[in-house]
Amino acid sequence: MLAFSASLCFKENAALKAFLVSFLTLLAAASLCAAQQTDSTSATPTAATYLKLAGEVDGALHNDVLNLWFPRAIDHEHGGYHSHFGRDWQREPSDGKFSVFQGRMTWVTSQVVLREPDKKAEYLPYIKQGLDFLENTMWDKQDGGFFWGLDDNGEVTPEFGDGKQLYGIDFCIYGAAAAYQATGDKRALELAKRGFYWLDEHAHDTVNAGYFETLTRDGKPVLPHAPAGQIEAGPVGPVGYKSMNAHIHLLEALTELYRVWPDATLRARVEETLAVVRDKICVEPGAMNLYFTNDWRAIPGPDSYGHDVETAYLMLETDELLHTQASEKTERMARMLVDHALAYGWDKANGGFFENGPTFGPPEDTRKEWWVQCEGLNALLMMHQRYGKQDPIYFQRFLEQWTFIKNHTIDSRYHGTINMTTAEGKPLTEDKGSIWKAGYHDGRAFWNVSARLRELAQNP
């Protein structure tokens, strides 16, 4: 009896084991099939997929960028645009008028007219608001050039100083050039040209290429000074040195101006700046140094993943404008920048790009900033459009990036983009607008992504 029971038990266990093995095998097969279907969707998305995503991005562009900033940011009392808004988009006390913010918002309003003609009547006055302020207030009538920043009444302040910064001049030229393209107002073009001429006369480094970044009010370059070995910290980087950040945006600004004014000297400077960014600032295997001596010797520092992916886009945009098709050299470096950022700066658990880290190794700052996520979205889809048939990874990461933006970067309660979150997406900041946070990174990314998705839908 005992032997019979043991035998029966063995047979029942064997049958159960066989059933479990079969069940788990089927479950694994089903999971693999589902995974393959997901991967297949990512690798070969349909026109319907692209159009659905384009609709979502359009919604974010209008509900979380344009409809929040305008007309809310129009400063009827002082001119220009007000920058400081709380999480609920209530106006906060002014932080003054900052060249970067004023130029960027002039560019944004101009892009609305260029890309969405049905809004032209509404936005033309908003462009004029920015252009008038750049011309009548930000431009230094005494010594020329654009001020770095002023108070609301257009006066020099200790916080901003009376000097000039390449980074700020970049965006004033950028905004004025876009305003001309959108409106045909010749004073916008003349202002952009005046800014370029002043910058080229005072800041162009004719020996080493590139531009000096910190200037006195009358346009004299401020060179490095290190009493006791300590370099003065400037608003963009160490005073007297050249930076990645100011030069990638110089490339952006000069490209925008060349789009409407194909001047020979300007073209030479655009070509030079592209070469500086691609061949001196960018390095294999796809990282960028942040700061340089004036003869372009790199100063050690971390790699900024957001600037990597943004620069990939900016280089290709410039090269295509200059030569119709980007060179193999530019294509190669742009792809390396995105691939390196994915390899070292991508959050595989939550999606999205971290803030920064060493060239080789895990990230040091795992926070996630709104502009990094938006520039990442733009760059990933750009890479998918170019190389998606070879490698599905770009579209897979694009979908993950968009999911993170929808779920965490965009504020579901008050709308708009949250400046900074944890890696998991928990908000770390409250303000929706500041002198450094305009509607530029997210607006541009959403416009570009929407247009690119519709192009892809035509030829999936």
Regions found by a protein language model. Name each.
Residues 36-460:
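Glycan-recognition and catalytic cores of secretory/periplasmic carbohydrate-active enzymes
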Residues 5-7, 22:
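Serine residues within intrinsically disordered or low-complexity segments
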Residues 19-31:
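Bacterial N-terminal signal peptides
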